[in-house]
């Protein structure tokens, strides 16, 4: 049976005797079986939950937080629907900001309100309307599901509020539930948990389709916020692979994430977020490149060190990265990357490098740490620097916690409803044939390649097998990596070779072929997704909106949701929203700041593009959860029959 993480639960539960006896312990008589059967069949009639899929966040923690908190614009639309004509714009904006940012909004308003009566008036203005919203978003859940989502300390109260209208509770009853919170200073925590519950009920599942970090300010902030969401699933991207590899001590991955952090001026995520000091790199840079202007090493983002030092730091870690990549390539001939082992191809006398059998002049010829008799060997200063960083990365508790979370919640692909979700591509040749790649000694392609890689990643976090650690680096930049999908990553060329021919990176044919409907159907069949209604969803390759590109491909069965979330690459971003009645893309725009949202009511109001519509609207029965419900129902029906026949226990009643 497929792993549950993929949402591809297949087949019915066998009605064998051992299972029936186990079920009989939980449902000891006919009445309990009939009750559960009724509840399961009723659950199958509920509308399917709303799923949001985002991708390529790249460290933009504050923007992601806003998109999660405003449910990709959905909460604003729902409030407009519920409160149209009932409240003025000022109260509407106040309500929104307290749902998006309850703590921050309270701290701002607390100083303005002063005395307790004014704070009580604010609570009395907000809570009844938030409870009305809570009742609305709770409709799609049965009581057992609600109990799993409601915060434990507040669950009895929130349950009372949800059911109060059905029980015709008096205004005095409702006011009494608030009294102690106002009298004892518990208003903020109440508002905070109520807002989070509303958001968690509005979006039943958040899927992040890869690339949590790099380029943007704080990968640690992105993961921290995602970890607070009630129900999260992840498909890994190539940037996630490099961070997981670095956490586990793979040296080329360590150098890669260090170089990216320095290049984009994202030092705070290392120093403050993960407690990884950069002093070893500063010392290496000053010792080996102290008089080097490092003109080839531009940086982006805030200058948290002086400009010359940042350039030297970037060059020092880049050379170290290329050496460590060379060693990784030589350890793994099965990767087929001998042509990317570029340091031995440098001619230091002539200042040229041979790439793909062609010689190119180099823009930089100062390499004091390279021994041209053994170019991939680390110098003593580089060894010291690397040893310190390896220790720092492997001993960071926060990094281990966050990368373990990515590993545990992550997969190479997911299926939700009729959507096949993965980060990058399925590696194919020009004719659309699946390309094989060797994983842990076995040559695999297509869906089997995804499964083999997924198993290897989980193995890496259990055993730290060196072969698997090197595979994590290959996932970052290997041509047959499903999360990379290009012939090369031209980092070396971008630094040292001005010729655009050498810098060119060619995408896997997959990215063109997804415009072809028959190719998409082949992919959907490979992953056992409905070929008629199936939709392939991937990120990784930014949609060039400004150049007229569309996220929806010509096939109508593939969509790319990398909208250039990062400011560095366009400051857009998409959420794919899977609702009961439709699937649509919400395109996001620039987000100023949390402070601006609170003080001026600014919001990201997305542009919506409908991808699919469903009539009638889909229910739980139409989803993967519906498959699971049918399997549970079949098992319970078998137990009921066994009770009636007297073959299991003795029916009561």
PLM feature segments, named:
Residues 1-653:
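Feature recognizes metal-dependent phosphohydrolase scaffolds
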